[in-house]
Amino acid sequence: EDFRTWLMGWHLEQYGKVLRRSIVEEVVQNACAIAQYVNKQTYKLGVRVSRVDDGSANPKELYYDLGDAVVHITRDGWEIVDDPPIVFKRYSHQEKQVRPDATSRKADIELLHKFVNIQSRNDWLLFLTFVISAFIPDFPKPLLLLTNSNGGGKTTIMKLTKQLVDPSVLDGIGKIYNCESIVRPASKHALLYFDNISYINQDISDTLCGVATGTSLVNRKMYTDLDD
């Protein structure tokens, strides 16, 4: 549908005329056929974070989508690139990320501590592990469970973490009705959080674990049931 809209907009801009729907459908069908049976070139599709699939368990190159450019990350450093080998899917809810400043002083992840209300050193290290893991694609993720009294800053911590990893105009999910209400949004976010959830059943628990670890069943649901 995005391609159809782009095609109609491009034709209107170039020729000042609106394409008939029948012509649009013919172009789309021809493009799909060429892509599948002639070109046959495939691209890895990422959502906010991705990697070049070199078959290794420890990726040597990571890519992070800023929304209008991409950060290429290696063990030697990072750079902003405009034409990465990764194709990122950008959803309407996503916001552009702040561009990192290569001229700033050496970053210190401990500076994040002054923005979050985590007192225990052990809890703080667990939180940092969660944040760092969110930037590693195709990797089993831990599930972060925040507990505190009312007004203890749980929602604030998750909103900050969401904006740090995967900025979005959407807030966290307040209700989980079924497994589908997890799988669908999880396929459109690099980081997803649930707010004020008091109970989950076994099926939902299993689905959450599947999303975190990337099981094949959950992945199949993501890519076959993605249309809203």
Residue ranges, per PLM feature:
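Charged, alpha-helix-enriched surfaces in structured cytosolic catalytic cores
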Residues: 2, 22, 26, 122, ...
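Segments of Walker-type
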Residues: 2-122
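Conserved catalytic/switch belt of AAA+ P-loop NTPases
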Residues: 162, 166, 205-227
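Short, intrinsically disordered, charge-balanced linker/junction segments flanking boundaries
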Residues: 1, 114, 224-228
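Conserved RecA-like P-loop NTPase ATPase core
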Residues: 131, 155, 161, 193-195, ...
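Conserved AAA+/SF3 P-loop NTPase catalytic/coupling segment centered on the Walker-B
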Residues: 191-212
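P-loop NTPase catalytic core of nucleic-acid-dependent motor ATPases
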Residues: 77-188
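Conserved Walker
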Residues: 172-181, 197, 215-228
